[in-house]
């Protein structure tokens, strides 16, 4: 009998990168891993309105680097960068080390509706507002298709529309090749808290296939070409340097 494997874990080192990039001894590894978890929980809880899709953490000696991928960078940066300093102080307080150097880099998400986590968050918000789940899924599919994704799958499970018996409903549009390792699959989960209980949301988005050693993403059926020079807008914090 077949079982579904986590799409991100299956592709680590192929089309996906690790969200925590550091090395540690066997004694320090669990401590630093728990630190990463606390940092992510703190950021998602306090800055939920900023539409943060991913938090990448890297460690170099005594320096901690945090990269935030967000749909609304202005909410994080704040006026004249005041939000960055507040975020840095909050991270230092979370890990219990105010002397640790924390460097923060905010990256704007190019296509919001093509991001699996942000799409799952949108679905959760609509379900919590008591919008019918089928209408919510249909609207989410339309938004993703307008963003130019090649395929997506959405699954919602729980007491849908307040039904007595929990069930799972899903829909798929386009191609979602979960067995193809070179396929770039963006996967995310989210929980919606409703008056009838919690609903589990899963989103798979197929963005293209990665070709060659340069990890170049190419839509299926298109001729290979290099990406343009345009880069997503970045807000890099260098106040701790020098």
Curated annotation (Swiss-Prot):
Please tell me whether the keyword Protein biosynthesis is annotated for this protein. Answer: no
Task: Kindly list the GO CC terms recorded for this protein.
Answer: cytosolic small ribosomal subunit
Q: Which residues form a coiled coil?
A: none
Q: Where is the KH type-2 domain?
A: 39-110
**Which branch of life, at top level?**
Bacteria
InterPro entries (UniProt xref): KH_dom, KH_dom-like_a/b, KH_dom_type_2, KH_sf_prok-type, Ribosomal_S3_C_sf, Ribosomal_uS3_bac-typ, Ribosomal_uS3_C, Ribosomal_uS3_CS
SMART domains recorded: KH
For this entry, list what GO says about its biological process: translation
Q: Where is this region: Disordered?
A: 217-242
Q: Name one Pfam family in it.
A: Ribosomal_S3_C
Which Gene3D superfamilies has this protein been placed in? 3.30.300.20, Ribosomal protein S3, C-terminal domain
Q: Where is the composition biased (Basic and acidic residues)?
A: 233-242
Q: What keywords would UniProt list here?
A: Ribonucleoprotein, Ribosomal protein, RNA-binding, rRNA-binding
Task: Give GO terms: molecular function aspect only.
Answer: mRNA binding; rRNA binding; structural constituent of ribosome
Task: Describe the family membership recorded for this protein in Swiss-Prot or TrEMBL.
Answer: Belongs to the universal ribosomal protein uS3 family.
> Assembly and interactions?
Part of the 30S ribosomal subunit. Forms a tight complex with proteins S10 and S14.
- Tell me, in a sentence or two, what this protein's role is: Binds the lower part of the 30S subunit head. Binds mRNA in the 70S ribosome, positioning it for translation.
Question: What NCBIfam families does the record point to?
Answer: rpsC_bact (TIGR01009)
Q: By what name is this protein known?
A: Small ribosomal subunit protein uS3
In which organism is this protein found? Prochlorococcus marinus (strain MIT 9313)
Mind giving the lineage of the organism this protein is from?
Bacteria, Bacillati, Cyanobacteriota, Cyanophyceae, Synechococcales
């Amino acid at each position: 009998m077949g079982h579904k494997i986590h799409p991100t874990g299956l592709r680590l080192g192929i089309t996906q990168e690790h969200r925590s990039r550091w090395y540690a001894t066997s004694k320090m590894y669990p401590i630093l891993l728990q630190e990463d978890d606390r940092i992510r929980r703190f950021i998602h809880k306090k800055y939920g309105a900023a539409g943060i899709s991913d938090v990448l953490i890297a460690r170099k000696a005594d320096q901690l680097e945090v990269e935030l991928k967000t749909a609304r960078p202005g909410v994080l940066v704040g006026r004249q960068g005041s939000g960055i300093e507040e975020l840095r102080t909050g991270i230092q307080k979370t890990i219990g080390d105010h002397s640790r150097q924390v460097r923060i880099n905010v990256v704007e998400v190019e296509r919001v509706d093509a991001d699996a986590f942000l799409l799952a968050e949108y679905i959760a918000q609509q379900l919590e507002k008591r919008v019918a789940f089928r209408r919510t899924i249909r609207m989410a599919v339309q938004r993703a298709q307008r963003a130019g994704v090649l395929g997506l799958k959405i699954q919602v499970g729980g007491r849908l529309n307040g039904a007595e018996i929990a069930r799972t409903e899903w829909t798929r549009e386009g191609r979602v090749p979960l067995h193809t390792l070179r396929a770039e699959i963006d996967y995310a989960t989210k929980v919606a808290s409703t008056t009838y209980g919690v609903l589990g949301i899963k989103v798979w988005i197929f963005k293209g296939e990665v070709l060659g050693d340069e990890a170049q993403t190419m839509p299926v059926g298109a001729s290979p070409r290099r990406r343009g020079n345009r880069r997503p807008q970045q807000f890099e914090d260098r106040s701790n340097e020098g």
